[in-house]
């Protein structure tokens, strides 16, 4: 016989970003609890609103499964003393299992007898096991916790209710300072406390109190309501997924509505309006069917449609205050002078250990010129890079960016154009922040890409130089994101600049404001970002092999990893890799540089391998390079079958090692083949 279990925790309003991850955690913890306690079940369904986290288990067994376990103990010679009595070791072993020496039997394992005991445990009733089910709530982890009242414990938010039902039976349990029952809270304004009749009636009972417990249902309600407004008003609404996920976790009973604002604010840059609505007010942006921004917005109320006109007016009033600020800053910032703002950056700290933003820009200016040369930019582009690097942080001191920091770079571009800067310069000011996430948009222009690289390189090297190196998951200065951006930009723009050479040359630059340090750590950090870019779907041994190659060009490293993944499916992969790996391992025994002397060859296999290596011409086509290297496998194996490399003749040995080393030197431009797994 099976039953349904419901566990609901009622809390003060949770931060929106915590709700969905916590709901997911709760489901995972419940599954683990049931599996660990040998309670079978059919399905687990989770629920969440800003004021509750809940999980329902359907088809829960009424009793644990019985358990029979065999335990292996000490060997017989240790378990018995000289008189044939059970030793203290044997007695201690069975006592630890809750058994006695009468339960001991001996079993032979690989020719030797060992103590074995078999423990039988009859399954407990589900009611008894569920006495500790609140463990799943204790085990939930949150970004931050809080204390309340005079309690010694802490949790994400104060807890008000706990409901634990097995079908319609309320279980008597405690969690923190709350005793369980069947009382749950309805909507804060429209509902009231309500009894949950049974685990199966959970959603319906709460719906009567204006609470939609299922997040997916709430989300669909919002989407349907927005679509209905779209159809009625002949408009188009941007349903941003992140915003939708946030909004659904701000409401328990959603009602979408259309608001408006004065058309005069459309003279303010669109980005300001969108940021005000979307980021600050959690409103959905409204456009006409051609994509033109309209003086409207859609918001979602936490409640029903009653007195919705008052809610609309209130939301419009709040938004207008934001738009007034935007309009004011837009007009006032245009009175500022870029040169004056750049000069003031001398007083703005980049980091207390590193210096000012002005000094950061000075270093970026030098780095960007070096990179522009390496990337073979035109003279016109180089001039644009130089100008952009000289001013690109000025907008940080504008009123608009101070109020809306999400618009840094975006407003810089607009103000630069108004001040008469070249479009390439203005675009670079915006693009130097790109990408802003692991899969964010990249710069579109070469000038912007070079400035982005220079800014990110100086940021990386500066923080590493003063010892501010990320550890574990801690990365307060977003250096991983900056480095990922470097790798992505180099690959996307096809700038095949070897990273080891590039970083070494950057470390060779001299600045009065800062001396770069920790080059080795920087290179390791960059390699880790390249590995991240290669992706976890590529086997770990392949990732390691290409990162340990002598190739430091991002695009070639990525291509080599894909080529190896493709080749690993071939029947000859194992044989080819093993032959090259053997050469790699022997080449490590080279103690000093020796030129291959063909006059010392004793057999045709040495000559054949020597000629094959001389004829081996590798290019920047990693797939072709692998084909050529794998084609050598029969020649390499023939060499090993007929040649003693580690001969007693020292001169002969060093010559053969040098021969293999010449092969490895070429092969290592693709991968360190000895790191590949062929088992």
From Swiss-Prot:
Q: Which reaction(s) does its UniProt entry say it catalyses?
A: tRNA(Gly) + glycine + ATP = glycyl-tRNA(Gly) + AMP + diphosphate
Q: Which InterPro entries match?
A: DALR_anticod-bd, Gly-tRNA-synth_bsu, Gly-tRNA-synth_heterodimer
Q: Where in the cell is it found?
A: Cytoplasm
Q: What is its EC number?
A: 6.1.1.14
Name the predominant localization: cytoplasm
Pfam families linked to this entry: DALR_1, tRNA_synt_2f
Indicate whether Aminoacyl-tRNA synthetase appears among the record's keywords: yes
Q: Which PANTHER family match?
A: GLYCINE--TRNA LIGASE, CHLOROPLASTIC_MITOCHONDRIAL 2, GLYCYL-TRNA SYNTHETASE
**NCBIfam families, per the entry:** glyS
Q: Which family does it belong to?
A: Belongs to the class-II aminoacyl-tRNA synthetase family.
Q: What is this protein called?
A: Glycine--tRNA ligase beta subunit
This protein's species is Streptococcus agalactiae serotype Ia (strain ATCC 27591 / A909 / CDC SS700)
């Amino acid at each position: 016989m099976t039953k349904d279990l419901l566990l609901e925790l009622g809390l003060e309003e949770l931060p929106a970003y915590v709700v969905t991850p916590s709901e997911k955690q709760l489901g995972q913890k419940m599954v683990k609890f049931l599996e660990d306690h040998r309670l079978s079940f059919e399905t687990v369904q989770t629920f969440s609103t800003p004021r509750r986290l809940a999980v329902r288990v359907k088809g829960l067994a009424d009793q644990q499964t019985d358990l029979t376990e065999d335990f292996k103990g000490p060997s017989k010679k240790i378990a018995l003393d000289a008189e044939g009595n059970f030793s203290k070791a044997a007695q201690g072993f069975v006592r630890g299992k809750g058994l006695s020496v009468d339960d001991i039997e001996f079993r032979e394992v690989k020719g030797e007898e060992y103590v074995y005991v078999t423990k039988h445990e009859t399954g407990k009733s589900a009611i008894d096991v569920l006495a500790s089910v609140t463990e799943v709530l204790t085990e939930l982890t949150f970004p931050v916790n809080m204390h309340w009242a005079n309690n010694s414990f802490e949790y994400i938010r104060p807890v008000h209710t706990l409901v634990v039902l097995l079908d319609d039976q309320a279980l008597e349990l405690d969690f923190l300072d709350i005793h369980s029952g069947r009382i749950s809270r309805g909507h804060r304004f429209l509902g009231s406390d309500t009894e949950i009749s049974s685990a199966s009636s959970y959603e319906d009972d709460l719906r009567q109190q204006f609470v939609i417990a299922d997040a997916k249902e709430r989300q669909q309600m919002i989407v349907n309501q927005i679509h209905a407004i779209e159809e009625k008003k002949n408009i188009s609404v941007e349903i941003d997924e992140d915003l939708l996920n946030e909004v659904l976790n701000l409401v328990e009973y959603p009602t979408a509505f259309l608001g408006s604002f004065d058309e005069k604010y459309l003279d303010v840059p669109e980005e300001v309006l969108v940021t005000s609505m979307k980021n600050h007010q959690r409103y959905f942006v409204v456009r006409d069917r051609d994509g033109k921004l309209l003086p409207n917005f859609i918001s979602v109320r936490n409640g029903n449609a009653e007195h919705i006109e008052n809610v609309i007016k209130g939301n419009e009033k709040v938004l207008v205050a934001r738009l007034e600020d935007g309009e004011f800053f837009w007009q006032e910032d245009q009175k500022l002078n870029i040169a004056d703002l750049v000069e003031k950056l001398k007083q703005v700290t980049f980091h207390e250990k590193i210096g000012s933003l002005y000094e950061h820009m000075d270093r970026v200016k030098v780095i960007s010129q070096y990179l522009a040369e390496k990337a073979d930019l035109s003279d016109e582009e180089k001039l644009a890079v130089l100008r952009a690097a000289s001013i690109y942080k000025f907008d940080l001191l504008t009123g608009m960016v101070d109020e809306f920091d999400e618009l840094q770079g975006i407003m810089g571009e607009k103000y630069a154009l108004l001040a008469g800067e070249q479009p390439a310069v203005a675009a670079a000011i915006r693009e130097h922040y790109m990408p802003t996430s692991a899969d964010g948009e990249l710069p579109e222009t070469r000038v912007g890409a070079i400035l982005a690289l220079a800014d990110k390189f100086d940021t990386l090297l500066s923080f590493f130089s003063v010892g501010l190196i990320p550890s574990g998951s801690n990365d307060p200065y977003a250096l991983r994101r900056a480095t990922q951006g470097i790798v992505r930009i180099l690959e996307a723009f096809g700038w095949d600049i070897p990273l080891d050479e590039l970083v070494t040359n950057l470390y060779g630059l001299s600045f009065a404001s800062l001396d770069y340090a920790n080059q080795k750590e920087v290179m390791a950090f960059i390699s880790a970002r390249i590995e991240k870019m290669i992706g976890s779907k590529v086997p770990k041994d392949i990732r390691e092999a290409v990162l340990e190659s002598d190739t430091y060009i991002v695009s070639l490293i990525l291509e080599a990893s894909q080529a190896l993944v493709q080749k690993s499916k071939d029947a000859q992969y194992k044989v080819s890799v093993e032959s090259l790996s053997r050469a790699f391992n022997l080449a490590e025994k080279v103690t000093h540089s020796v030129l291959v002397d063909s006059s010392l060859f004793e057999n045709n296999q040495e000559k054949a391998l020597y000629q094959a290596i001389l004829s081996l011409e590798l290019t920047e086509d990693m797939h072709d390079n692998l084909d050529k290297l794998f084609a050598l496998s029969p020649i390499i194996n023939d060499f090993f079958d007929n040649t003693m490399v580690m001969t007693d003749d020292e001169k002969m040995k060093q010559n053969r090692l040098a021969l293999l080393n010449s092969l490895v030197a070429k092969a290592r431009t693709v991968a360190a083949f000895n790191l590949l797994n062929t088992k």
